[in-house]
Curated annotation (Swiss-Prot):
Lineage of origin: Bacteria, Pseudomonadati, Pseudomonadota, Gammaproteobacteria, Alteromonadales
Protein purpose: The RuvA-RuvB-RuvC complex processes Holliday junction (HJ) DNA during genetic recombination and DNA repair. Endonuclease that resolves HJ intermediates. Cleaves cruciform DNA by making single-stranded nicks across the HJ at symmetrical positions within the homologous arms, yielding a 5'-phosphate and a 3'-hydroxyl group; requires a central core of homology in the junction. The consensus cleavage sequence is 5'-(A/T)TT(C/G)-3'. Cleavage occurs on the 3'-side of the TT dinucleotide at the point of strand exchange.
Recorded superkingdom: Bacteria
Name of the protein described by the UniProt record: Crossover junction endodeoxyribonuclease RuvC
GO cellular component, one term: Holliday junction resolvase complex
Cofactor stoichiometry and binding remark: Binds 2 Mg(2+) ion per subunit.
Active-site residues, as the UniProt record annotates them: 8, 72, 144
GO process annotations (BP): DNA recombination; DNA repair
Subunit-level organization: Homodimer which binds Holliday junction (HJ) DNA. The HJ becomes 2-fold symmetrical on binding to RuvC with unstacked arms; it has a different conformation from HJ DNA in complex with RuvA. In the full resolvosome a probable DNA-RuvA(4)-RuvB(12)-RuvC(2) complex forms which resolves the HJ.
Statement: the UniProt record of this protein carries the keyword Hydrolase: yes
Binding site for Mg(2+) 2: 72
Length: 178
């Protein structure tokens, strides 16, 4: 059994999704968004935003007790400043996982969409639909939470494939599968 915490990092909203994997069965445990937005009068500094992401992810780890952690990789944004902030948000979440001694897996947006929808160029609405279908959800989660659940699902699918390959390798005798 694995409990997987998936993270969709962001400098304003960081999505999280937690699933349980028992063999081929996937169960929804929780999802939501970490809001790192201050007020108009008192905006948060970058350091405060990063601390809030780190502390919130640490709390999620304490609450759900995952044994695996997966996060979306940084994509090259048109605005280099946005890509840097996204990378820093990822770093804050990864440090929280590292402090809890969780293995960290990283997936590109294309890998996640391919794994969940079957099309690496899928639209966000398609990802949300498949997340709902795969986890038997009655309501559509927030966009960032759905993306984080997709990260967790991608990791679950990847680990299932690795287990299959490892099992097949053990069954190989002189180049033949049994």
């Amino acid at each position: 059994m694995a409990i997987i915490l998936g993270i969709d990092p962001g400098s304003r909203l960081t999505g999280y999704g937690v699933i349980e994997q028992r063999g081929r069965q996937l169960n929804y445990l929780g999802s939501g968004c970490i809001k790192v937005i201050g007020t108009t009068k008192e905006p948060l500094t970058l350091a405060e935003k990063l601390r809030r992401i780190h502390d919130s992810v640490s709390e999620l780890i304490t609450q759900f007790k995952p044994n695996e952690f997966a996060i979306e990789q940084v994509f090259m944004a048109k605005n280099p400043d946005s890509a840097l902030k996204l990378g820093q948000a990822r770093g804050a979440a990864i440090v929280a996982a590292a402090c809890a001694e969780l293995p960290v897996a990283e997936y590109s947006a294309r890998q996640i969409k391919q794994s969940v929808v079957g099309n690496g160029g899928a639209e966000k609405s398609q990802v949300q639909h498949m997340v709902m279908a795969l986890l038997n959800l009655q309501r559509c989660p927030q966009e960032d939470a759905a993306d984080a659940l997709a990260v967790a699902l991608c990791h679950a699918h990847s680990s299932q494939n690795l287990i299959k390959m490892a099992g097949a390798a053990r069954k190989t005798v002189r180049g033949r599968l049994r």
